[in-house]
């Protein structure tokens, strides 16, 4: 892989993580392709979810590889109660080994989300983030100073494009239980569909956000506090912001930046809106004051 796009103080750790992923893609793919990969285990993770076999196998594989990096002090999986910590290193990695596992048996797109933090697991210390999506193609998206997209081909990640969202999109990925949506959110969504936006929600957050990114705009929304800050929300929020979009939530009817949120506990959850600029304005108009 050509690393010419990665510059700045955090470039080296990003390159090291990508290098590990590039070498490990085939192993990860083998794990996902096993006939029983989507079978549920009899275990329960720290968030109260029942992981599938591929979740645990990918988690073990990634943890071992991330801990092998000299400059990584701590590694924290969504599947674990607390981080695994070493004596040395400057960076902390939080990751969701298999986002979208609940729809894997339907052969939908799934992926691995990774946040690279510095000093501690706080949003303001998020140095970079990336994800890998597994489908008929394997792709990598990385946020450092900008957002870069790669495709895996012949054992290497090849650069496709620098992603920048346009002001307005045409995709809506609205997750959660619609009966619990506020009246403002229902009106905002109705307005998008009146403007011929297309519904593209799969149940895999990484897949739906990837769709918004490659279509250069739109809305991903999850108004219930179900998504984990450290492993899903913060890393994808950084990617959206670096792609010139907005990442926000509403606190008593006031729109606030996701990456300004604090973290009171490791597995704390949040609502989440990831959008291009126009859609952010529309959502604020309808949800303000609710």
From Swiss-Prot:
- Subcellular location field: Cytoplasm
Q: Name one GO cellular component term.
A: cytosol
Reactions it catalyzes: beta-D-fructose 1,6-bisphosphate + H2O = beta-D-fructose 6-phosphate + phosphate
Q: Name one GO biological process term.
A: gluconeogenesis
This protein's UniProt keywords? Carbohydrate metabolism, Cytoplasm, Hydrolase, Magnesium, Metal-binding
What cofactors are annotated for this protein? Answer: Mg(2+)
Q: Which GO terms describe its molecular function?
A: fructose 1,6-bisphosphate 1-phosphatase activity; magnesium ion binding
Enzyme Commission number, as recorded: 3.1.3.11
Give the note describing cofactor binding and stoichiometry.
Answer: Binds 2 magnesium ions per subunit.
Under Pfam families, the record lists: FBPase, FBPase_C
Which sites bind substrate?
Answer: 99-102, 201, 226
Coiled-coil annotated spans: none
Q: Which NCBIfam families is this protein grouped with?
A: PRK09293.2-1
Provide the family line.
Answer: Belongs to the FBPase class 1 family.
Q: Which HAMAP family match?
A: FBPase_class1
Q: What is this protein called?
A: Fructose-1,6-bisphosphatase class 1
Where does this protein come from, organism-wise? Helicobacter acinonychis (strain Sheeba)
């Amino acid at each position: 892989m050509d690393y010419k796009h990665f510059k700045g103080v955090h470039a080296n750790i990003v390159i090291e993580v990508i290098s590990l992923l590039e070498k490990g893609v085939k192993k990860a793919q083998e794990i996902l392709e096993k006939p029983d990969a989507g079978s549920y285990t009899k275990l329960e993770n720290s968030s109260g979810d029942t992981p599938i076999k591929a979740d645990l196998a990918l988690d073990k594989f990634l943890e071992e590889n991330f801990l092998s990096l000299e400059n990584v002090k701590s590694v924290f999986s969504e599947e674990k109660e607390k981080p695994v910590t070493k004596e040395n290193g400057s960076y902390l990695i939080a990751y969701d080994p298999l986002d979208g596992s609940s729809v894997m048996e339907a052969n939908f797109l799934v992926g691995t989300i990774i946040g690279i933090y510095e000093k501690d697991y706080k949003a303001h210390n998020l140095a970079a983030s990336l994800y890998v999506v597994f489908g008929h193609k394997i792709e990598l998206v990385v946020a450092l100073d900008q957002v870069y997209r790669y495709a895996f081909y012949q054992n290497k990640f090849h650069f496709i494009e620098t992603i920048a969202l346009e002001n307005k999109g045409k995709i809506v990925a609205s997750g959660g239980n619609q009966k619990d949506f506020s009246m403002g959110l229902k009106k905002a969504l109705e307005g998008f569909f009146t403007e011929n936006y297309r519904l593209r929600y799969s149940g895999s957050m990484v897949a739906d956000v990837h769709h918004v990114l490659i279509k250069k705009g739109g809305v991903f929304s999850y108004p219930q506090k179900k998504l984990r800050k450290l492993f899903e929300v913060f890393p994808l929020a950084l990617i959206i912001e670096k792609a010139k979009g907005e990442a926000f939530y509403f606190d008593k009817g006031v729109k606030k930046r996701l990456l300004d949120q604090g973290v009171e506990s490791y597995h704390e959850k949040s609502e989440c809106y990831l959008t291009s600029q126009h859609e952010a304005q529309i959502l604020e108009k309808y949800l303000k004051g609710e």
